[in-house]
Amino acid sequence: MDATFWAFIALVIFVAIVVYMKVPGMIGRTLDERADRIKKELEEARTLREEAQQLLAEYHRKRKEAEKEAGDIVASAEREAKALLEEAKRATEEYVARRNKLAEQKIATAETDAINAVRASAVDLAVAAAGSILAEKVDAKAAGNLFNDALAQVKSHLN
């Protein structure tokens, strides 16, 4: 019996003790538990990844909606500003037109007043000239006849 035989016997006894103590089952259970734990962690990681992708897609969608809404707001503001500008321009043009018309009316009134004043002055001058000419050339009897004729003409024009 040499040392190899005793080493073989020791190995057989060791294997028998290991089998008797159910070490292979414990190793199997430990490996199974570890595999289950790894499987659960992988499933949890997959679930978290899917949730993250859903959140990312939702944030992209919300960002696009916000960009679209901002674009709509800017377009609406531009339309309103353009409308306000056109309204202000129209109101200014109307104001200028009213002021021009009023100024033209004042000018026309001033022209009419000036023409009437010139005519009145001309009439006064003509009456004064006619009066002085008549005073020099007409005697009292002819003046009375002229006065009566003029009075008759005025009466006929008034009736």
Swiss-Prot record:
Domain of life, source organism: Bacteria
Protein's membrane topology? Single-pass membrane protein
Q: GO CC annotation: what is one?
A: plasma membrane
Summary of the function given for this chain in its UniProt record: F(1)F(0) ATP synthase produces ATP from ADP in the presence of a proton or sodium gradient. F-type ATPases consist of two structural domains, F(1) containing the extramembraneous catalytic core and F(0) containing the membrane proton channel, linked together by a central stalk and a peripheral stalk. During catalysis, ATP synthesis in the catalytic domain of F(1) is coupled via a rotary mechanism of the central stalk subunits to proton translocation.
Q: What is its main location?
A: membrane
Query: Where does the UniProt annotation place the signal sequence?
Result: none
Database matches in PANTHER family: ATP SYNTHASE SUBUNIT B (PTHR33445:SF1), ATP SYNTHASE SUBUNIT B', CHLOROPLASTIC (PTHR33445)
Q: What is this protein called?
A: ATP synthase subunit b 2
